Amino acid sequence: MTVEESKKRKLTDDVAIKQNEKKIKKDKKVKDKKDKKDKKDKKDKKEKKEKKEKKEKNDKKDKKDKKDKKAEQVDKLSETTEQPSKQVKIGAYVENEELSKQPQSVIDEFFKENEVSVEDPSKLNLRPLLAFNQISLDKEVQNEIAKFPKPTPIQAVSWPYLLSGKDVIGVAETGSGKTFAFGVPAINNLLTSSSKPKGIKVLVISPTRELASQIYDNLVLLTQKVGIDCCVVYGGVPKDDQRRQIAKSNVVVATPGRLLDLIEEGSVDLSPVDYMVLDEADRMLEKGFEEDIKRIIGQTKSKDRQTLMFTATWPKEVRELASTFMKEPVKVSIGNRDELSANKRITQIVEVVDPRSKERKLLDLLKKYQSGPKKNDKVLIFALYKKEASRVERNLNYNGYKVAAIHGDLSQQQRTQALNEFKSGKSNLLLATDVAARGLDIPNVKTVINLTFPLTVEDYVHRIGRTGRAGQTGTAHTLFTEQEKHLAGGLVNVLNGANQPVPEDLIKFGTHTKRKEHGAYGAFFKDIDMSKKPKKITFD
């Protein structure tokens, strides 16, 4: 073998060795990688197994805990639903033994069925009265309330707190029995007092003359047989007789304006008042009575005063007013008062019509709602303003209808007479503007007709609330025109909320809500920015 061949062979061997080493190195790398992967897979598998075992163990433990907790809850529920509560005594209020024996399940069902919520800062958790025999009252008061089948929800829940001396806020629809809710504890307190009452002990503030008169009529049912004097004072009538009445009365119902007049002239002393009621508080604020209310409250002694506030809605303004003069009030709400909602016992019918055909349509509706077996049914018709009401009144009289009317063009005496005629059945038609939209308790109104839609959807809800009161059913028939289309969205929401049909013609106007403005009468004053100062114009 030559030297050259030897060198060539050696070179070939070196290349082969290097290639072999490279292959061994590569194989080792692959093997290491595989081993590493296998090791990782083994570790992952082990961790997964451990995790699964741990999860199964935890699930088993959770299942056992849930089972134990459920068993504990069942035991507790059994105790609360089957065991009577301990008898409660707070101040002058002693819970009736029969009420104490009621299973908690019965109480819970009452709250659920009547959509009752109670916010009680003192955590007294007083049980509602399910029957009149579950409360101990003066005999005459007991006899008067026994004429009714059972307490209304607002009465059932508020009476125990009021008889315990607590301040109470009642948020409930009109027609829910609010007058007796505050009236019964007030009169009972006077009758069971250790000393004979002197001066004004009970003061009820009301936004309108009509509502004040109505409250007075209800309270007289409680006071007339027990020797307690009660009077009502409001504007529009001479003061002389009111001065004489108020001087000898222990219970006074008043509108803010007339009461302030009597206070300022020295005819009224409110220092003895120890039970004060603001009825329709939200409406009083709407009417601009806030400062008047504060001045009246300032005439009483806050230390000894028990204060009540009843309201159909719970806006910010009412909350702020309550916080300024009430002491840890118990808030009782009946129904869903956070949202604007209509009484579900009312059948709502909305017709979209041409504005020019409304009064002709009204005559057709009266034939429908006051014929045959419905001949003597009470019908309440709402106009928007007194000018419209006067025109419609003349038209109805011309067409042979006997109609009673209450609106701003009439004197107080004429309005009172009209209400009495409607209540007594002498007239089965009442024509009203929104002065009567809230608070008036006119029994057995079967139908409300909205001839012209009100300025706000809130007013619509209050208007139709004149029917379907005290557990009864009713009908509200509304004539809606293109002039009110900006209110269509809010009306649709109310109809949907009460599970009432929504006409296609109404939906065509759109379902979004706009600012409060009436097409025929202009902007609703609350939506106009009154804070803007006039712009000064200068000429060079």
From Swiss-Prot:
The keyword ATP-binding applies. Residues 1-89 are annotated as: Disordered. A motif (Q motif) lies at residues 130-156. Residues 1-35, 53-62, 68-79 have a biased composition (Basic and acidic residues). Its EC number is 3.6.4.13. Gene3D superfamilies: P-loop containing nucleotide triphosphate hydrolases. It is found in: Nucleus, Nucleolus. Belongs to the DEAD box helicase family. DDX5/DBP2 subfamily. Residues 361-510 form the Helicase C-terminal domain. One of its GO terms (cellular component) is preribosome, large subunit precursor. Its main location: nucleus. A motif (DEAD box) lies at residues 279-282. One of its GO terms (molecular function) is RNA helicase activity. GO terms for biological process: endonucleolytic cleavage in ITS1 upstream of 5.8S rRNA from tricistronic rRNA transcript (SSU-rRNA, 5.8S rRNA, LSU-rRNA). It comes from Candida glabrata (strain ATCC 2001 / BCRC 20586 / JCM 3761 / NBRC 0622 / NRRL Y-65 / CBS 138) (Yeast). The keyword Transferase does not apply. The Q motif is unique to and characteristic of the DEAD box family of RNA helicases and controls ATP binding and hydrolysis. This is ATP-dependent RNA helicase DBP3. Residues 159-332 form the Helicase ATP-binding domain.
